[in-house]
Amino acid sequence: MTPVSDAPATPSSEISAAGQSVFKLFSRPMLGQSFDGIRISIASPEKIRSWSFGEVKKPETINYRTFKPERDGLFCAKIFGPVKDYECLCGKYKRLKHRGVVCEKCGVEVIQSKVRRERMGHIELAAPVAHIWFLKSLPSRIGLLLDMTLKDLERVLYFENFVVLESGMTPMKRGELLTEDRYYQLIEEFGDEFRAGIGAEAIREMLVDLKIPEEINQLRDELRDTSSEARRKKIVKRLHTLEAFQDSKNSPEWMILEVIPVIPPELRPLVPLDGGRFATSDLNDLYRRVINRNNRLKRLFELKAPDIIIRNEKRMLQESVDALFDNGRRGRVITGTNKRPLKSLSEMLKGKQGRFRLNLLGKRVDYSGRSVIVVGPELKLHECGLPKKMALELFKPFIYNRLEERGLATTIKAAKRMVEKEKGEVWDILEEVIREHPVMLNRAPTLHRLGIQAFEPKLVEGKAIQLHPLVCTAFNADFDGDQMAVHVPLSIEAQIEARVLMMSTNNILSPANGKPIIVPTQDIILGLYYMTSERANVAGEGMIFSNTMEVKQAFDAGVANLHASIQCRFRGKRVHTTVGRMLLADMLPERIDFQAINKLITKKEVTKLIDHTYRMCGTKDTVIFTDRLMAMGFAFACRAGISFGKDDMVIPEAKRKLVDAAQEKVKEIEKQYTDGLITEGEKYNKVVDIWSHCTERVADEMMGTISTDTVLNKDGEMVEQPSFNSIFMMANSGARGSAAQMRQLAGMRGLMAKPSGEIMETPITANFREGLTVLQYFISTHGARKGLADTALKTANSGYLTRRLVDVAQDCIVREEDCGTSIGITVAALVEGNDVVETLGDRLLGRTPVSDIKDPITDELLVKAGTIMDEDIVEKIENSNVDSVLIRSPLTCETTRGVCVTCYGRDLARGTRVTVGEAVGVIAAQSIGEPGTQLTMRTFHIGGTASRQAEQSHQETTHGGVLKFHDLITVQDRAGRYVVLSRNSEVSLHEAVEHEGQVEAGRERERYRIPYGARISSAPGSVVEKGTTFAEWDPFAMPIITEVEGIVKFGDLVDGVSLRENMDDTTGLISKEVTEWKGQSSKKGDMRPRITLKDVNSNETLMMPNGSECRYYLPVGAVIVVNEGDHVHGGDIIAKVLRQSTKNRDITGGLPRVVELFEARKPKEHSFIAENEGMVTYGKDLKGKRRLVVTPDSGEPMEYLLPKGKQLAVNEGDWVRKGEPLMEGSPVPQDILKVLGLEELCRFMVNEIQEVYRLQGVRINDKHIEVIVRQMLQKVQITDPGDTMFVSGEQVEKDDYLLENVKTDKRGGRVATCTPLLLGITKASLSTPSFISAASFQETTRVLTEAAISGRVDTLNGLKENVIVGRLIPAGTGNILSQLKKMGSLTKGEKSTQGGEQHVAKVASSSEVTEG
């Protein structure tokens, strides 16, 4: 790798000649060496020799007696530099005065010994060998250039076959392989008419002869003429490689090595152990092998040994070089003495223990310590308690400095002695030094940026760090033995950044969702809930006070009870309140209304209150207020003395009755099953449903019993008040526990899941207070243990997800104020079923509208385009008639390599406009990844109790109004009700508007989807009340319904082949089920089980209303409920397909589902979607597949091959719209992008991912997901290259594509066209323009091989590559420096040294340093 810079390179000959220049080169790192990029390319033999300081000729390392390096060996001092500073090997020249001298006796240069970390050597190979990376890394690069297969190449390189180099007049072709026998036979036949070679020499000759420009032209012509897709792909691959070589000025023959570099000895150390043994790096073994074989080969050449021996030696040399570069890539792994594989150069770079991830991305730092944390409730929010011993060690340099300044110590040594003796003055100085010097605390795992925060230290006795309770949520810390690390920012710049950006008081809001993260939890909430509760008939009720002081006195004196209802004058108003709430009122910031706390305070209320305070009063007031709230909460939690006893778990009296009633219902279902009215699957579904309802009813009863107390008030009447039951208070306040856990304590445990994931039909009717029977306990253990196992597995998965997300998004930075785009995405309120999951306001907060938003009815301007919407604007929009808004999004932002402020909107962690330079990609990745671990860890809290949602089986109205039907096709059944036959019908509910005595439909309020087979009881246009049920359906079975009256005729339903008659063991009844008929082909070829309806009189096949024949095709698993020859009426059910008995909806679907979406994988049971709208017909089936044809009004029909026996979502003759599913299952994200476009893909990804997190109650802002999806869409695939440089089918960066098109357009050429590509996050990370970032992520060798061939330049734009080369990252405060550098405002003389040390560099270079 070479830095792309303006600095001239120094050839080795000059270095060794001029000792003085060497000193300058190595005296100290040159700060001025500035570069804008790093290029990687293949090293030529000349280049390798120019790096080298001498040839390594012997395999010896060091002399075992003297421990001195052997001459010309792997550790030779002459080549690599002296072992001791400024001292030659033989000891003739010592000390600084001889520096730069080359000793004439031992040939060692007198210089610092650290050059042994920098100087390289080389080995001249006696025969060329192939570089294994270019040979074996798929696809083989040498193979692509020569158009040979890897197998053939290996045969030549490893001396099995000869290859024809020049065919001359013979019938052979160039590049043809010959066995040894054939070769000698041909030699006899043709003599030297032709030439063939073997081994790397032959391959090298072929590479030298390769004429790249001619090959490229030939391939381009071929590409134009070929029609075969496979051939085309092959040509494109080859073309790529050839063009890469042409553009990068790499010579193909450099992939065959004639000389190999030897890395500096300090990087492959050899350490003598006691007892005369040595510990050595594996590389030395590998190098030794190469040198031994190389020397032996040279000797064989001199001895003119027979060909076969030489060939064998050459093969062994090739193998040893292979092992040195990448051990185990080909053939057997070379092992050391203890049968352990040796670590090659590739292993030094790869993986978590490789150079990239271990030393370049993760460095250990000085001035840090770690200790156990304990709670520090008396600290202020910006403080932490630091043990004195730790502080003394961490702040040593500052203390030494201060001691010298004060004249208490004359030298550093004296200061050191004073500190070691821990004299009295030292402690005083420590206090001074620490004052207002922030330290950073970090708790591993650091899942998001709030895992490191800055605090001001307070010295404490003991050895534990004290942590403020309110920051525990951000760190995810508790005090059960957690440890934290302390880091000291040293420079003044670092201290400023720590104070301004990282101080805990500046991180009140969570970057994931913009809600406060500094919120009281647990005991504090319990205390606040207790002190704001109201109780009837206690001391002081009805008293009236003139101010809060009086209330406090009355409370302290015991006259007024904490819960007494009183009146008081507060801020000039009379308020009805309680004593406890008045005590809180004292702390309320000025601008917050008293009504905000004049209520029962739960966790939700506190969060709202702090959020409101932050928006109204700013940071300082919020911090003071939260600190006071915390103190008050702790104090009253202590005074409340809330405990937990078994009698607090109140079992509802109605429980027995409810359980008995449920058992009765279950018996009835069992009876229906034994009578054969329902199938086993239906029975299972219904039973599970009954128990789900029962469990919920019992839970509701229990909550009803426990949540209120009936007491006498002061007038002697019985009144209800919120309960003071301890368990209820804990759960209701949000301090600890949940309704689900209380249900298990005092309700019933409910349904449990089997190990397979299915739900068992028999629930646990007992609760923990009653105790479980042995069987119930046994059933429970599985759920509990599974939870623990899951936790361990998923923590790792979640960490890996975060790593991939960070990697894909790390170079997404806010680059500019406004990109000026006019496109965006439309958002509306999110509705699931009948509940609004997220309001329009929530989704718009902190976003920017594309155009002005006006009220559609009043035409009032609500917000101008380009304004970031804050709480007030959002409230205005909520109260207006606006349903959806087109907003700017990171997805549609047109900024290159980043996003703009306007498209991103509000910085969630600060509540203000995002600033240029903010690393929004990393924040997005952390916000999505951090709850990932919670998702995974939350499974076991409910201990496997199956919480299965009772299925929705009807639709009722949520408001009153007028019904309108859309796309609805119905048929009337025998009972006169309408049965829905369309697949995508919707019902909209409109406001009822009176017009000339008629009720008409006004603005649309809601829309409901009505499934196929639903029975509708209200007519279109009818006026309904709130809560009217207008449609019902069976949630557990999908019916197949007749549209006309006729006689049933079976087709292809052959008993024992495609039809199975199941006789139920328990009932003795027979049900007919369609089965899989694969492999049992009937005489007629393929089977298509179906039911046809014939006319009652003429026995001809009836026609449907849409003109197609009346045939119903049956999927595998359909249960037929009619018999052949039955007379059926329109709207009758002839067969039904049972829905799968639902598995437990646990978050196990969670993390894997999120990963599946971000990796853009095809879901297991994926569905197909219609690519255009048209009429559905069934085509001729293919083996194992069913052919579906969608014919549009105009244009070509589209064919889809669907797996047989899967439930289709459409019937023959249905009209489908573009993007509609043709069968059941999850859609493939790539299909959505292709068919419906970017906006629909965004909506799909955001909604699907949010749904997983919402199940866990985790809130993430949509824009984070949009940022990641943006990064997944950075590539496009060329469909037509036009006159550009691209090749058809090539994948290129979006920015490069646009740039090339602009250039071509200017030239007057034809521009290229493309389709957008959706890449999974792993693939997107690996195809990033920065090869350093990609190599440090995964597949290091492949990435580096590819980059070297194309001579790629890494322009160091992302964060990761800058960390690796040791610069400040170009984000946040480092953004300014990188911008200045780009603008070129830093003149050549004072190139940025990234750290403000230009003047140091100047001084150092101008003054000659003299040392004695």
Swiss-Prot record:
- Gene Ontology cellular-component terms listed: DNA-directed RNA polymerase complex
Q: Which Gene3D superfamilies match?
A: 1.10.132.30, 1.10.150.390, 1.10.1790.20, 1.10.40.90, 2.40.40.20, 2.40.50.100, RNA polymerase II, clamp domain (4.10.860.120), RNA polymerase Rpb1, domain 3 (1.10.274.100)
What's its EC? 2.7.7.6
Q: Does the keyword Transferase apply?
A: yes
Q: How many cofactor units bind, and how?
A: Binds 1 Mg(2+) ion per subunit. Binds 2 Zn(2+) ions per subunit.
The entry lists its GO molecular-function terms as: DNA binding; DNA-directed RNA polymerase activity; magnesium ion binding; zinc ion binding
Q: Name one Pfam family in it.
A: RNA_pol_Rpb1_5
Q: Where does Zn(2+) 1 bind?
A: 88, 90, 103, 106
GO biological-process terms attached to the record: DNA-templated transcription
Does Repeat count among this protein's keywords?
Answer: no
Query: Which residues are recorded as binding Mg(2+)?
Result: 478, 480, 482
Domain of life the protein comes from:
Bacteria
What SMART domains does this protein map onto? RPOLA_N
Annotated region (Disordered), positions in chain: 1387-1412
Reaction catalyzed: RNA(n) + a ribonucleoside 5'-triphosphate = RNA(n+1) + diphosphate
State its role: DNA-dependent RNA polymerase catalyzes the transcription of DNA into RNA using the four ribonucleoside triphosphates as substrates.
Q: What is annotated about its quaternary structure and interactions?
A: The RNAP catalytic core consists of 2 alpha, 1 beta, 1 beta' and 1 omega subunit. When a sigma factor is associated with the core the holoenzyme is formed, which can initiate transcription.
**Annotated family:** Belongs to the RNA polymerase beta' chain family.
What name is this protein filed under?
A: DNA-directed RNA polymerase subunit beta'
